[in-house]
Amino acid sequence: MSHIQRETSCSRPRLNSNMDADLYGYKWARDNVGQSGATIDRLYGKPDAPELFLKHGKGSVANDVTDEMVRLNWMTEFMPLPTIKHFIRTPDDAWLLTTAIPGKTAFQVLEEYPDSGENIVDALAVFLRRLHSIPVCNCPFNSDRVFRLVQAQSRMNNGLVDASDFDDERNGWPVEQVWKEMHKLLPFSPDSVVTHGDFSLDNLIFDEGKLIGCIDVGRVGIADRYQDLAILWNCLGEFSPSLQKRLFQKYGIDNPDMNKLQFTLMLDEFF
């Protein structure tokens, strides 16, 4: 993502709601990095006021924003997360206003301080182990392989999968080929934990060298631990294969299951 402008200035929307009072006096910037389908605006520059984020989803994306609100409420007991300021839901739209976690994303830190890569990966591994240690019996959300495959097939059948955004390994593949090759990797035994669902470098926040929280938790749920490991491993590949190897070492896996890893990355292409 380093080759694109991560934010562009934008104007404040008119919501005509009790949320409006919290929006006045801020400067606005539109996020260009997220791929959730929602619009994400950063609110900043208001004297003596914290930075905020406003996420808006329409249609099916409104359900995704609602899912994130519900998971934020549940996850706050276990992990450092943004705080919900307001949530509005109508039949077609959802708006979620949260506090910002101060700092920079792991991606930004790795770009600015490439020599800190090993320390960053070590912190990510510790944080991920903490997340995966949440008792599965406490989690009310299912994000397992079967659930995600049903969602993926629906998106494929409705033409919602963007083949132009596939990883380099699958560049030029039709969606149906990814679906076919993915199923060749089945079956395998699940190793279920509470997962983030999109444990990417852009969703992990560092401040003063410490990993202090995560964002974008709309896919939190019980799934195989490789749901998180594979996505983070893939992100680290933009920087160095040595960081990818270190991730598994520090997480505590001596022999990564490449079958699970590749399955997860193929499945993620559908979202």
From Swiss-Prot:
UniProt feature coiled coil, ranges: none
SUPFAM superfamilies cross-referenced by the UniProt entry: Protein kinase-like (PK-like)
Source domain of life: Bacteria
One Pfam family hit: APH
Keywords carried by this UniProt record: Antibiotic resistance, ATP-binding, Kinase, Nucleotide-binding, Plasmid, Transferase, Transposable element
CDD domains noted in UniProt: APH
EC number(s) given by UniProt: 2.7.1.95
Enzyme kind, highest EC tier: transferase
Residues at the active site: 198
Record bears the keyword ATP-binding: yes
Gene Ontology process terms (BP): response to antibiotic
Gene Ontology terms for molecular function: ATP binding; kanamycin kinase activity
Keyword ATP-binding recorded: yes
Catalysed reactions, semicolon-separated: kanamycin A + ATP = kanamycin 3'-phosphate + ADP + H(+)
InterPro entries reported in the protein's UniProt record: AGP_Transferase (IPR051678), Aminoglycoside_PTrfase (IPR002575), Kan/Strep_kinase (IPR024165), Kinase-like_dom_sf (IPR011009)
UniProt record similarity statement: Belongs to the aminoglycoside phosphotransferase family.
Function as written in the Swiss-Prot or TrEMBL entry: Resistance to kanamycin and structurally-related aminoglycosides, including amikacin.
Protein name: Aminoglycoside 3'-phosphotransferase
Species annotation: Salmonella typhimurium
Source taxonomy: Bacteria, Pseudomonadati, Pseudomonadota, Gammaproteobacteria, Enterobacterales
